[in-house]
C-alpha cells in the first residue's frame, strides 16, 4: 500500500536489557540488500527503568559502563564486565559517531540527559516516541537529533508523557528538528497507516 521500505527495530522484552539489539532499513520490493546502515535500539525512561532495577539513574550508570568496557577502561576479564565479546564488537561500531542509536524515550528531562550523555560519549542518537521532545526542541535542533513521533499520541499515557499533544511534530519542525513518524504500538501491520498519521500531523500545524 505504498510502503517501499521499513526500519526493522529491536525491542527490549521483560527481564531483558535496556539494549534491545540491532535493526536496519530494508526494502520491500523483494531485494535482500539492506537499504541503509544498522541501528542500535535502546529503551530508556520509565519503560527502561523496569529493566534497570527500577532506577532511571541506573540506566545511565549501565550505559556509561558499557562504553567504558568498549573503550578498555574496564577489562573484558573483569568479573564486573557486562558485555560479551560480540557485544563489545557491536557497540564499538556506534561510538564516536560511527552509527546511530535509536532511543525510545519520552520525558523532556530524560531527553535532556540523553543529549548530554550523547555529547559526552560522542554518540549519534535518534529519538523514538518523544512525547515531550518539543520542550527541548532548540537543543535537539542544535544537536541535529531526529525525532520519530506518533502524530496521534496526545494523551498522558504515563507520567513520562504528560506533555503529549497533537502538535508535537509541528513544534519540533518549527524549531528545525528533523521529524519522522512511527506508530506508538510499533505494530508492523499498521505501517500502512503512516501516511494517514502524516496527514494528522499536517492537520495540526506541520
Residue ranges and their predicted role:
Residues 102-107, 124-132, 152-158:
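Catalytic beta/alpha-barrel core
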Amino acid at each position: 500500500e505504498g510502503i517501499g521500505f521499513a526500519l526493522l527495530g529491536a525491542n527490549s522484552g521483560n527481564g531483558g536489557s535496556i539494549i534491545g539489539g540491532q535493526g536496519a532499513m530494508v526494502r520491500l520490493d523483494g531485494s535482500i540488500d539492506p537499504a541503509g546502515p544498522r541501528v542500535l535500539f535502546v529503551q530508556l525512561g520509565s519503560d527502561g527503568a523496569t529493566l534497570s532495577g527500577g532506577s532511571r539513574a541506573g540506566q545511565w550508570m549501565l550505559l556509561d559502563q558499557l562504553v567504558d568496557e568498549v573503550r578498555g577502561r574496564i577489562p573484558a576479564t573483569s568479573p564486573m564486565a557486562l558485555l560479551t565479546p560480540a557485544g563489545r564488537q557491536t557497540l564499538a561500531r556506534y561510538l564516536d559517531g560511527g552509527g546511530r542509536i535509536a532511543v525510545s524515550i519520552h520525558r523532556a528531562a530524560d531527553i535532556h540527559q540523553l543529549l548530554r550523555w550523547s555529547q559526552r560519549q560522542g554518540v549519534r542518537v535518534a529519538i523514538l516516541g518523544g512525547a515531550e521532545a518539543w520542550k527541548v526542541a532548540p537543543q535537539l535542533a542544535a544537536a541535529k537529533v531526529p525525532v520519530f513521533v506518533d502524530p496521534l499520541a496526545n494523551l498522558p499515557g504515563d507520567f513520562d508523557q504528560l506533555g503529549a499533544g497533537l502538535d508535537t511534530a509541528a513544534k519540533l519542525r518549527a524549531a528545525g528538528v528533523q521529524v519522522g513518524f512511527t506508530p506508538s504500538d510499533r505494530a508492523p501491520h499498521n505501517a500502512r497507516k503512516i501516511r494517514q498519521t502524516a496527514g494528522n500531523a499536517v492537520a495540526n500545524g506541520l
